[in-house]
Amino acid sequence: MASSVGWQTSASAIEIAMDRIKSEHLIDNIGINFIYVFDDCNEAKAAGLSSKLLMDANVSAIVGPTCNAAGLAVVNLAGYYNTPVLTWGLTISSSFIDTSKYPTTVTIVPVAKSIAAAIHEVMIQFEWTEFVYVFVEDEKCGYFRDDLEQITSDSNYTSLSRTIQIYDQSYTNLVRQLEKLKTVSRIFTVCLPEAGDIKRRFMLAAYDLDMTTDEYVYLFAGPKSTAYQQTSSTGDVVGIWVDWSENPDGRDEEAKLAFMRTMVIVATPVQGEQYAAFKKEVIERMKLPPYNCVDECKEKEYQEAAEYADQLHDTIYLYALILNKTIEEQGIEQIANGSNIVTRGAGIEFEGMSGVVRMNGIGYRLPNMNLANLDSNATQRTVAYMDIDSTSVNWTFAIIDQALIWDAYNGKLPQTRPECGYSGKSCPVNFFVDYLYIVVIVAVIIVLCCAAAAIAAFLVIKARRDEELRLDDQWIVPHGMLQSIIKGRKESHHSSRSLQSNSTTTTGTTGISSRSVFFPETETQGYFVYMNEPVLARKYQLRVPIFKQDRSELRMLRSIEHDNVNRFIGLSIDGPVYMSFWRYCSRGSIKDVIAKSSINMDGFFIYCLIKDIASGLQYIHHSPIKQHGSLTSECCYINDRWQVKIGSYGLSFMQGVEKRTEDGLLHTAPEVLREGLTSGTQAGDVYSFSIVCSELVGHSSAWNLENRKEEADEIIFMVKRGGRTPFRPSLDDVDDDINPAMLHLIRDCWDEDPKQRPNIDMVNKLMKNMNSGRSGSANLMDHVFSVLEKHASSLEDEVQERMKELVEEKKKSDILLYRMLPQQVAERLKLGQSVEPEAFESVTIFFSDVVGFTVLANKSTPLQVVNLLNDLYTTFDAIIEKNDSYKVETIGDAYLVVSGLPRRNGTEHVANIANMSLELMDSLQAFKIPHLPQEKVQIRIGMHSGSCVAGVVGLTMPRYCLFGDTVNTASRMESNGKPGFIHLSSDCYDLLTSLYKEYNTESRGEVIIKGKGVMQTYWLLGMKEESA
């Protein structure tokens, strides 16, 4: 034990650690006193001593024990007292990292499970499927065996075929044991003590048995492996193959060759002179206080530092770091809290004497292990780095070139099992030597069969080639056989002319009907007659060579047949431009149908069109075409039965070089735009399908460009850019009869992530479910006929309803017209007849004027003036209607009325005007001015009877006007009258009094009238009392 964890060879590592702690001022304010007890790796003794330390000495922490059984007893007891235990040395049992049992344990030792995981990872990395574990009677090697058996039993890749324990470590016994293993394995994992020359003896035994050839690999592993170095009695670091005893055996070179067949798993140590100086200082400081080990430590066995002295150093330093962290974060009162000390160690990392120390949060060191070997010059180098956490290993090759790793093996990785087996007797039989006659017979048969197969293959290939040529003739469209369709009809026939001549012919024998519709020809599309049938042509601006695989694709396209896929006719390659030809569909494309807006597309109509597109796309995706790649509304054609047929598919050799049009880019998926894919994808087709659907449900072009502020290139840029909220067409303005599930499907189909879009099979399934409950029309044609029948029946009702509305509106317009013109005149104008001026022999004309109107106007606002006149004349108009009179016009406050025209009424006109004048005078008695209640309205009235001429003047706002001296005389009667009086001319007086005796009149006498001279005039005072 002295060579591993002996007190005489390791205790001073504590003082060396304390010197470092003090120099770094980690715990300046805390004094640490050490109590040394010796358990001698005895489990009972260790339990008793630790009990006294915990109960009597009230220690803050226990460092040790260094053996597994004793250590487990102590950590079990310390857990009860919540006192931290820091283990080191030989305590490699994996039980120490079980925090459920031992929550106060901190171990700096790489446990056996970690070493076993590293060994297992080596086997996996180099593809060794089985190996043998060789170990001596040593506690740590036993733990390795147990954990290695557990890990390999759970592994699906490598297995532990055998474990061999060596009890006698003599050279003779090593030879005997290895000779047994020679026929068992070629990959060996070896666990031997680090001290002494046991490793050298083991490898020399293998060398002597010829077990150090390129077939053998020996993997040494241990928590404290010194790799390929050892410290001699003089303190020098020499190779592990060197015999530095007093009587060397002289086999150092043979031992070196043997060690070139080994690999070692080692912790990352402090390299070189620093580590050697530490080990030397450990021995020297044991002679100094507080140890004063002078006489005892002179013994030869105590002249080299213990194997695990560096771990004791790192344990003390780690404890100081944890204390420092605990005090800074929680205070000094927590430094004896065992479970808390464990968690405080999380994240601590430092360069110790045992290598890089990294701690996790459960008191367990995460070992950094290296895999090392010797190169062809016997120089140690690191092959790989391993970061280990319990059973998981993060492997990184330090040397990438496998040949360089195995340069000592001539650059070849040793195999798990040799080609000839472990015994060397299982080499493959040389079949050609042992069975030559069978080989000859079989060879002859094979030659004959090959000749027959070659002849048959030739015939099959020739027949297939002839068939391919025949099928090629079907898709090749000679340019000379095309006829161009000329727009317009002549005598109910379409005319066309050959592309190769100037002669004009009539295509009365072709398949073009008198009702065929051909849409405008563009740079990419045209219409022709081929084989007496109209065809649709797609033009290509580039010419590309057509290879064998392209011809195969064209033959395949000719075989495509589906109700919703437009038939491919062929390809013309001998004209000015390449043109592909497709079956002509009389109703054009979906884009054309939407643009014409002549079809009433309801929800079911749109559903049927979309279902046809989805069905055709599903066929394409499951056909050898795989994807469409450039689906737009322009390549979805509709035949005369309103069936959608998808065209412009396939021709991948043209798609790869043809530049997409602007309309095509508006239908292209964002990932296709970003990645520049020319052939497209199935997910991209589903996106294009959704854009076409948005056109149908929105009754608009793609993205509704006509009503958007963005240009097409801006939309393409925003779609290509993507983002958290992708830019997509609006589905807000759709008809109410569109199924909401259809809108959800469209949004799913244009999802930014292609993986989130439904495939076309799912789309068709969802489309079918949308119509599962519909009764009535089963297809679009039935639906169209049903709609036409309903439309015809409702059209009759609508016509009758419109006629009623028209009659009502006519009545309203007639009433308005009759108020503007006399009815007789208006009727003639409505009939389009001219209204000639007409002379009337006897009429009576009435003029009136508001007295003092200017004064009233000055007292009123313009709006009040208008309201005053409107109220006054509304009162007058009601009186006029009762007296067979016609109001000619009102000019300001002047009022002109006539009776006796345009309907002649004999001599009643004078009585009508007289009665009307009297009623007007009476109505003024009760008339009030709303804004001038104290004011009274008075008028002057003038009347005159005589002849006049009437006629319509003007075209815009025509007026029925009176002409003649009678009009002027009536006006003079009004202007020369008095307020509140009715002024009559002598002619009017004579006519009135001669015919009607009931009126009360009075002579005014002679009055000078302007333009007339002296005239005898009269006042109309009212009705006689007996008449009233």
Curated annotation (Swiss-Prot):
Species lineage: Eukaryota, Metazoa, Ecdysozoa, Nematoda, Chromadorea
Entry keyword ATP-binding: no
TM spans (from-to): 438-458
Coiled coil (UniProt feature): 786-817
UniProt comment concerning the protein's domains: The protein kinase domain is predicted to be catalytically inactive.
GO biological process: cGMP biosynthetic process; intracellular signal transduction; receptor guanylyl cyclase signaling pathway
Matches recorded under PROSITE patterns: GUANYLATE_CYCLASE_1, GUANYLATE_CYCLASE_2, PROTEIN_KINASE_DOM
Keywords attached to this entry: Cell membrane, cGMP biosynthesis, Coiled coil, Glycoprotein, GTP-binding, Lyase, Membrane, Nucleotide-binding, Receptor, Signal, Transmembrane, Transmembrane helix
Compartment(s) where it occurs, according to its Swiss-Prot or TrEMBL record: Cell membrane
Name of protein: Receptor-type guanylate cyclase gcy-13
Cytoplasmic face residues: 459-1028
Function: Guanylate cyclase involved in the production of the second messenger cGMP.
Ranges of biased composition (kind: Low complexity): 497-511
Chain ranges of the Guanylate cyclase domain: 844-974
Gene: gcy-13
Tissue expr: Expressed bilaterally in RIM interneurons.
EC number of this enzyme: 4.6.1.2
Family affiliation: Belongs to the adenylyl cyclase class-4/guanylyl cyclase family.
Membrane topology: Single-pass type I membrane protein
Protein kinase domain ranges (all copies): 499-770
Gene3D superfamilies: 3.40.50.2300, 6.10.250.780, Nucleotide cyclase, Transferase(Phosphotransferase) domain 1
Region (Disordered): 491-511
Catalyzed reactions: GTP = 3',5'-cyclic GMP + diphosphate
Keyword Phosphoprotein carried by entry: no
Listed CDD domains: CHD, PBP1_NPR_GC-like
Entry's Gene Ontology cellular component terms: plasma membrane
